[in-house]
Amino acid sequence: MLRRPLLLVLFTVFSTLYAKDLRGVSPPTNESEAEVSPGDDEGPPEPGNEPDVNWRTLTIDPEDCKDKGKDCESLADEGNCLKKLNYAVGNCPWTCRFCKKENGDSKKCKDLAGERHCNGWKVKGDCVRLPDYMMQNCKLSCELCGPETRFKYTDEDVRCPEWAQAGYCSTNTDINLKCPHSCRKYKQRAPASTPYPYPVEALHPYQYRVVLPSVTILQTTTAAPSTQPAETTKAPPNTAAPTAAPTPAPTPAPAPAPTPAPVAPAPQTAPLAGSPPESTPEEQDDNSADESTEIEAGEGGGELCDEKHSSQQ
């Protein structure tokens, strides 16, 4: 009966000592020893699709921008800086590019981290995703300075190239002051049609991930093709329309002729004394008929006289 309590006491002591020893174990150096957390089985996060983390925790002062862990390079090369965010922030902030070094700025327009590395990080969108580090160590690749302004001007914000290309330099005074290089480089761009909708001063460095307003793309639904043949309607023959008979123009009513004024009868002159009275037209016709009869009779009498005269001879 005494063996069971004794075994229980020994097991408790052994468990306590083993737990204390585990506290001194260094962080895991490979994924097989790593502590599994939600999202660890997913692939490397794409720009703008990072795990749901509190980005305000990445505000690291330059004097604290130092690596403390021994596996920082492998952690970064394997893309686990965001997957194991809490460990990376506390032990590998510099290698994971979460901050900029104290007294690490340079006035020269060049990539302090190397052109090859900076170009690769720029393609991934890290100029905006990791602004503190990239602004200090990749300013040339991130287009914060360059030959367009003869290396005389340097932008103060990693969002300047996108702001300038969108036309905000001529519509926002704060952006114009923050972006002397980009606003000169893209001075020919048309002004933005709407004001910049976000705060120019970010609340924390990693708020920079949202640069330009999003554009909603309307998706048009395409109806599924029908399996039934479409009904075809025969077009009517191209028959010319009958020509309508022309409508005769209305005949204007004739204007009434003016009624002539009555002519007054000519005055009759009184016959002169001793002159025969004027005959009427009927009397003149009768007289002419009598005269013609007399002439015919005279001619006939002449012929008879000639016949008598010849017979007497």
Curated annotation (Swiss-Prot):
Residues 222-244 have a biased composition (Low complexity). Residues 65-99, 109-145, 151-186 form the ShKT domain. It holds the Pfam family ShK. It is found in: Nematocyst; Secreted. One of its GO terms (molecular function) is toxin activity. Residues 1-19 form the signal peptide. It comes from the Eukaryota. Disulfide bonds join C65-C99, C72-C92, C81-C96, C109-C145, C127-C142, C160-C179, C169-C183. Keywords: Disulfide bond, Nematocyst, Repeat, Secreted, Signal, Toxin. Nematocytes. In late planulae, is only expressed in a handful of nematocytes in the lower pharynx. Is absent from the tentacles and outer body wall. This is Nematocyst expressed protein 8.
